[in-house]
Amino acid sequence: MELVWGDVLLKVLFFIPNLAHGGAERVLVNLVNHMDYDKFDITVQTMFDVGIYRDKLNKQVRYIGGFPWYFKGNTLVYKLFTPKQLYKMYVKEEYDVIVSYLEGPSARVVSGCTNSKTKLVNWMHIELENEAYATHVFRNMAEAE
């Protein structure tokens, strides 16, 4: 799929578990803070509305926070729902591009997108070839693939 924006801003969603401390979270904030706002309409959405980097986002970047607190065992709760159900629970708008930032829960949510016009990207920081790790978040390896 070729993405062309012309006179229209390309709507991009970066979906990440949270903006707590960590290198990946900081890299995401730096990335979106340096994107061309004349070409991209950028939204950062978190599963959990926690983290020290929320206030570091530029004013041009829209932020959507998820649950107000992080709860232990959330991956087990998320396994009760299909990716499509999770996607509908979190993502309320249409986007041209959705970037699942970090492997795991955010990738599972974004994989539930059924809009064929949306380009899906998974920003990985590890390899998911390890079945034990993959099934920690996904129901099984088939769902992880």
Spans of model-derived segments:
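N-terminal strand-loop element at the rim of the active site
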Residues: 14-22, 26, 30, 34-77
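Short His-centered aromatic/hydrophobic patch
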Residues: 100-106, 124
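Short, well-ordered alpha-helical microsegments
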Residues: 50-51, 106-110
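Extreme N-terminal starter segment of soluble prokaryotic enzymes
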Residues: 9-13
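A short helix->loop->beta-strand "cap" motif at the edges of active sites that frequently abuts
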Residues: 116-120
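Membrane-proximal helix-turn-helix segments that form the acceptor-binding/catalytic region
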Residues: 87-92, 133-145
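An amphipathic, basic-hydrophobic alpha-helix
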Residues: 72-97
